[in-house]
């Protein structure tokens, strides 16, 4: 293998051009080029000279120099050699699909990417990005109306123009979609994009019904299914006949309803419920059980208390048995009487987009919910077909999808990489936020792990005291005996900003004492992790502000 330092590349497209130029040289079997590392690795016959390689790079306007030494990542070029010449079909264009497409090209494959709707998938278009923009706007409105500093900063009733907020939101969505999805695909000559709906013909070919009309058959060596998921609709009589909202419609509404009913008790339902409440809606949440009923009970209790303090009505153990829409008004029949609202948001989960794929043709196994069953390498029951993201039985987070897509591409081109989710962080963007990683106590006990735990309320965290906002807690779960940290649950303003430290601690198998011994910057929320760790053998109320 020959390794070359390449100076002058400014983007991934530059790396693609260098790769193409090198692989056009007779005798070059494969090349891997990395723009961030300013490096090319070339596997070639002995007849290929260094001067030939450097000349091909120079012809593109870049400067190359041969690197001398032992190279430890030779498997990367070996993978590319196996991937060279492969044709990979990818169904979808979201986080998993994009990560897989770019990695597959890097590994030497050519890619046909098929998208039936808008390029970019859920996250950038109708999920993470627009919802977080709306949540941020609602947070600003809330602070203008009410803050811990109202005694010295006069509170005001904000004048909210939802149409202008929506225009700002969608402009950023369009900008990110073009910069991170459309522009990247357009600039990569190894990726062909088809706009249409794909279904399997067999385990080596797809039929694509093109949006512009007609059909096209696409053959492949390997295929990745990354079709995502859509809002699930519960079987409530009358619901489908009514103009209810899912998160998709709620995020693009240009008005704020006076009364909003929300069916759901987890992430999407609660994030949007609070956002609409802060923008002016009177919100009522119908929870079949309690809020966040799958998590540690303290999480749901803390968020419920915070919501009720803001005037959001939370009806626990309440289900709608009938939905009607009469004279522009929703009427929900519940066990506690009728509930009336101007709009109804249904956010009870998401269902995988797999029904139209004809997965039975290649014999791909799905579970009872229609999610594709995969192993840690994203392999399905058919060796030619892989899957990643929300259409599978993995956790539905875009960063999990992207990591899965990358590993799927490596495995489709001859590698062997697994996705390890033992220290997977999760964040809910309510206020206070909810952030978790690893085991809850109940989950650990279910797996036969004996635990010890401590819960630190935020009135013991200097940053929270300085903010005059002590809502929430940080809970650490450790393995009894070893003292190893195995789980963290946090409810706190900006809890999402502290959880990654806990991820690294768990990933590196730190004990709670090792965590307590680390240096944490004073007056940061993440310092709460150190204080929580100290509670296993100290009373932190008796410590000075920044006691080590």
UniProtKB/Swiss-Prot annotation:
Binding site for Hg(2+): 545-546
Catalytic activity: Hg + NADP(+) + H(+) = Hg(2+) + NADPH
Domain of life according to the entry: Bacteria
Disulfide bonds: 123-128
Further information: The active site is a redox-active disulfide bond.
GO biological process assignments: detoxification of mercury ion
Record-linked Pfam families: HMA (PF00403), Pyr_redox_2 (PF07992), Pyr_redox_dim (PF02852)
Protein name: Mercuric reductase
Gene3D superfamilies the UniProt entry points to: 3.30.390.30, 3.30.70.100, FAD/NAD(P)-binding domain
UniProt GO MF annotations: flavin adenine dinucleotide binding; mercury (II) reductase (NADP+) activity; mercury ion binding; NAD(P)H dehydrogenase (quinone) activity; NADP binding; oxidoreductase activity, acting on a sulfur group of donors, NAD(P) as acceptor
Family per record: Belongs to the class-I pyridine nucleotide-disulfide oxidoreductase family.
């Amino acid at each position: 293998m020959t390794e070359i330092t390449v100076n002058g590349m400014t983007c991934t497209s530059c790396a693609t051009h260098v790769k193409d130029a090198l692989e056009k040289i007779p005798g070059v079997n494969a090349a891997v080029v990395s723009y961030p590392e300013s490096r090319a690795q070339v596997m070639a016959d002995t007849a290929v000279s260094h001067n030939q390689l450097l000349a091909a790079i120079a012809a593109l306007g870049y400067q190359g120099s041969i690197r001398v030494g032992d190279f430890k990542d030779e498997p990367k070029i070996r993978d590319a050699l196996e991937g060279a010449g492969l044709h990979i079909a990818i169904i979808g264009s979201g986080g998993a699909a994009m990560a897989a497409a770019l990695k597959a090209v890097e590994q030497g494959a050519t890619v046909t990417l098929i998208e039936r709707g808008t390029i970019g998938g859920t996250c950038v278009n109708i999920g993470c990005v627009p919802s977080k923009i709306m949540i941020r706007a609602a947070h600003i409105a809330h602070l203008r109306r009410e803050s811990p500093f109202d005694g010295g900063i006069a509170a005001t009733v904000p004048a909210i123009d939802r149409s202008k907020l929506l225009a700002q939101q969608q402009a950023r969505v369009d900008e990110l979609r073009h910069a991170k999805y459309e522009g990247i695909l357009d600039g990569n000559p190894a990726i062909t994009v088809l706009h249409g709906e794909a279904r399997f013909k067999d385990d080596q070919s797809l039929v694509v019904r093109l949006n512009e009309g007609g059909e096209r058959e696409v053959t492949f060596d390997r295929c990745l299914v990354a079709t995502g998921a859509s809002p699930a609709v519960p079987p409530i009589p009358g619901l489908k006949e009514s103009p209810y909202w899912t998160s998709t419609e709620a995020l693009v509404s240009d008005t704020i309803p006076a009364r909003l009913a929300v069916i759901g008790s987890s992430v999407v339902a609660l994030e949007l419920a609070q956002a609409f409440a802060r923008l002016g809606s009177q919100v009522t949440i119908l929870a079949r059980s309690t809020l966040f009923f799958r998590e540690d009970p303290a999480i749901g209790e803390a968020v419920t208390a915070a919501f009720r303090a803001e005037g959001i009505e939370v009806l626990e153990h309440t289900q709608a048995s009938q939905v009607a829409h009469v004279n522009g008004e929703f009427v929900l029949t519940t066990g506690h009487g009728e509930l009336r609202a101007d709009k109804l948001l249904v956010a009870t989960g998401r269902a995988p987009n797999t029904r139209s794929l004809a997965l039975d043709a290649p014999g791909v196994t799905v579970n009872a919910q229609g999610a594709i069953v995969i192993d840690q390498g994203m392999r399905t029951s058919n060796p030619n077909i892989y899957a990643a993201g929300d259409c599978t039985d993995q956790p539905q987070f875009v960063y999990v999808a992207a990591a899965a897509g990358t590993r799927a591409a490596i495995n489709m081109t001859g590698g062997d990489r697994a996705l390890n989710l033992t220290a997977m962080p999760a964040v809910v963007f309510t206020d206070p936020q909810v952030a978790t990683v690893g085991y809850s106590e109940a989950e650990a006990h279910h797996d036969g792990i004996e635990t010890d735990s401590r819960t630190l309320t935020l009135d013991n965290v200097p940053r929270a005291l300085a903010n005059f906002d002590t809502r929430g807690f940080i809970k650490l779960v450790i393995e009894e005996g070893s003292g190893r940290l195995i789980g963290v649950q946090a409810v706190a303003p900006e809890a999402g900003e502290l959880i990654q430290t806990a991820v690294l601690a768990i990933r590196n198998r730190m004990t709670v004492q090792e965590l307590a011994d680390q240096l944490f910057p004073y007056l940061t929320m993440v310092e709460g992790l150190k204080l929580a760790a100290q509670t296993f053998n100290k009373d932190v109320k008796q410590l000075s502000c920044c006691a080590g």
